Design a protein with these regions (language model features):
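Conserved glycine-rich cofactor-binding loop
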Residues: 10-11
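Conserved NAD(P)H cofactor-binding loop of Rossmann-fold oxidoreductase domains
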Residues: 82-87
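Residue(s) in the substrate-gating loop at a strand-loop-helix junction
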Residues: 134
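C-terminal helical subdomain
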Residues: 174, 190-231
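Active-site helix of classical SDR
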Residues: 114, 150
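Substrate-binding pocket helix/loop in short-chain dehydrogenase/reductase
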Residues: 90-92, 98-103
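Conserved glycine-rich Rossmann-like NAD(P)H-binding loop of the short-chain dehydrogenase/reductase
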Residues: 24-40
Length: 256
């Protein structure tokens, strides 16, 4: 059996990545912040599931996770660096400590974990890394003004790392979901925005499937979502930043 690591596996896109990698025959190391990660094995059958509860916004949490991987004494074939969060609201009002926590999870923690994963896979000259970023990487993100840049960082990181890892036989793919029906926007305190309703958003199972298909096809990136999402991403590559910022604010600006 091959082994796959998925961060943010207790919910949403990460949960679907874990479930679908299990269906593809991978043993799973699934990571989440809260105790609900311990239920992951109830949803995946026929493979080994190792749940890890760790705070990936901290160096200690990353080292705790990596110690689990090392104790398994098995090669890691797939790593999905997926855990992330947002914080909605006007930058004037949002809490700085919460923003710094988000940067610690979405950027610093990802880089810390990637360092371990990349060295491990380069030693073996094999492996595949899927980095979940966002269509928000393609636009300014008013009312999520720190979140969007964290996704741009991860997209640029993924594309650069991909080039470096080619000579080691390690693949790197970026998954850019459009708005997806998960806990994400509620957790970000965005219930009072258009993004706050899950009614119109993409199915996380579809987004995960597209990510995994692109990963195994060796693509550099993939937009996650339906045709409208892919059309919107293509449009965003042509519009000016001020126009995109106004368009994004229509969905992210609090209505109350
Ligand atoms: N949903 C969207 O519209 C959307 C669009 C574009 C990109 N994305 C990206 O997709 C990724 C997954 O988001 P999602 O929509 O699936 O969100 P979600 O349903 O809220 O799931 C977030 C996952 O991350 C885990 N997590 C949160 N903070 C953590 C921490 N400090 N340490 C370890 N794990 C932590 C959560 O664990 P607990 O459940 O235990 O808290 C959960 O498993 C994110 O990187 C996000 O930027 C989402």
């Amino acid at each position: 059996m091959d082994l796959a690591l998925i961060t943010g596996a207790s919910s949403g896109i990460g949960f679907q990545l874990a479930r679908q990698l299990g269906e593809r025959g991978y043993d799973i190391v699934g990571v989440g912040a809260s105790a609900r990660i311990n239920d992951l094995g109830d949803h995946i059958s026929g493979v080994e599931v190792v749940p890890v509860q760790a705070d990936l916004a901290t160096a200690e949490g990353i080292e705790q996770l990596w110690a689990v991987i090392e104790r398994l004494e098995r090669p890691l074939d797939v790593a999905c660096l997926n855990a992330g969060r947002s914080l909605g609201g006007a930058f004037l009002d949002t809490d700085l400590d919460e923003e710094l926590q988000m940067l610690a999870l979405n950027v610093t923690g990802q880089v810390r974990l990637a360092k371990h994963v990349v060295r491990h896979m380069a030693d073996r000259q094999a492996g595949r890394i899927l980095i979940t970023t966002s269509c928000s990487a393609l636009t300014p993100t008013p009312y999520e003004s720190i979140y969007g840049p964290t996704r741009s960082f991860m997209l640029s990181f993924a594309e650069g790392l991909r080039e470096e890892m080619k000579e080691y036989g390690v693949g790197v793919t970026a998954l850019l979901p459009g708005a997806t029906a998960t806990d994400f926007h509620q957790t970000a305190g965005m219930g009072n925005t258009k993004f706050g309703s899950n009614d119109w958003k993409n199915d996380p199972a579809l987004v995960a499937e597209q990510g995994l298909d692109a990963l195994f096809a060796g693509e550099d990136h993939v937009i996650g979502g339906d045709q409208a999402t892919r059309d919107d991403a293509a449009l965003n590559r042509t519009l000016s930043d001020p126009v995109k910022a106004t368009k994004f604010a229509q969905a992210s600006r609090p209505t109350t």
